[in-house]
Design a protein with these regions (language model features):
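N-terminal, active-site-proximal structural segment of metallo-dependent hydrolase catalytic domains
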Residues: 2-83, 97-103, 178, 249, ...
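Active-site beta-strand/loop signature of hydrolases that rely on acidic residues for catalysis
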Residues: 24-30, 51-80, 108, 147, ...
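Short, solvent-exposed loop/turn segments at secondary-structure junctions
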Residues: 30-33, 74-75, 96-98, 112-114, ...
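Short catalytic/ligand-binding loop motif for oxyanion handling, primarily in non-cytosolic enzymes
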Residues: 33-36, 75-78, 98-106, 117, ...
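Alpha-helical scaffold elements lining the catalytic groove of polysaccharide deacetylases
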Residues: 42, 171-185
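Structured beta-strand-rich core segments of catalytic domains in phosphoester-bond hydrolases
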Residues: 66-157, 161, 165, 269
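Metal-dependent phosphoester-hydrolase catalytic domains
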Residues: 171, 185-198, 204-302
Length: 302
């Protein structure tokens, strides 16, 4: 598995261009809005302003930031869009029908910084192009949103994949991992130039799970790209809306397919509960910072 500290990067960046792009990627399961909250859970109307403040803080001064979310039903997507302001927009559809039904896995970006060149939604099933399809032993439809962006001022490209694996079906999780490995490969080149492909999401698996290991055999966990002294915060990403750490798990991850040329800065699992004792979500956001070459020519194949 590709878990070691691999420091590609600084030399490759310097030879291609003295300029780099300061990147921040986030993945965050925001917990879908429900009519009646469970133990420890506040309603979305209470959590929403806290989450908006957190997101605005984490993206402030980082124009190239890309943020992906899970469990966002359409009204929540609209709330995030409104809370982040006019400088942001998003790409993504509902998993039930490929339109507005069911949970989204949206990717938010600033269109003044990134131009959306291509995007697609695939269902994690034997028929990935069939909206609403349920794969293998999954309990629900599951999707991955994929988007390729071009940096407006430099032409550099990056692809981001946002997904949410099934919480019941182990076969579905393993097969979904194989599907995403293949998709990451398909999205890894453009006009004979390679580009970094990132995968963020709530995978509902810990690192000892075969589904995680399938991803780690072909991609790199961003956490392990960053030296330990530059990792911050929690290890566990799911809290179940409780303060008891015994039921916390590490199930939210960010992977990268090809880290060559990237200079890794920091990794963090952020807090979601403060003095007001309100959980913003039952998941903690995962954030990785890195620098990437600002010229597309830096990653020419051959």
């Amino acid at each position: 598995m590709r878990l070691g500290h691999l420091f590609f990067g600084t030399t490759a960046v310097a030879t291609a261009s003295s300029r780099t792009i300061d990147m921040r990627l986030m993945t965050y399961n925001i917990r879908l809005a429900v009519g009646v909250g469970g133990p420890g859970e506040e309603l979305w109307s209470v959590r929403r302003p806290l989450m908006t403040s957190q997101l605005n803080h984490e993206a402030a001064g980082r124009p190239e930031a890309l943020m992906c979310f899970q469990e966002a039903i359409y009204p929540q997507v609209q709330d995030l869009d409104e809370g982040l302001g006019n400088e942001w927009t998003y790409v993504g559809v509902g998993r039930d029908d490929g339109a507005f039904g069911g949970e989204f896995s949206p990717i938010f970006y600033r269109p003044s910084v990134w131009k959306l060149e291509k995007n697609a939604t695939y269902w994690l099933s034997e028929t990935p192009n069939e909206p609403g399809s349920v794969g293998w032993d999954a309990a629900l439809p599951r999707i991955v949103t994929v988007a390729r962006f071009r940096h407006d001022s430099s032409g550099a490209r990056i692809a981001y994949m946002c997904t949410h694996f099934d919480h019941i079906g182990q076969e579905a999780r393993e097969q979904s991992a194989h599907l995403l490995v293949g998709l990451a490969g398909e999205w890894s080149t453009h006009n004979n130039k390679s580009l970094p492909v990132f995968l963020g999401g709530d995978l509902n698996v810990t690192p000892d799970n075969p589904a995680y290991q399938t991803l780690a055999s072909d991609m790199y966990d961003a956490k392990h790209m960053v030296p330990e002294e530059r990792r911050f915060g929690n290890v566990k990403t799911y809290t179940a809306f409780t303060v008891d750490a015994d039921d916390d798990t590490e199930i939210d991850h960010i992977f990268v397919r090809d880290p060559a040329g990237l200079d890794w800065v920091s990794f963090a699992v952020l807090n979601t509960r403060f003095e007001d004792e309100i959980f913003i979500s039952d998941h903690r956001p995962v954030v990785v910072d890195f620098k990437m070459p600002s010229q597309a020519e830096a990653r020419h194949l051959g």
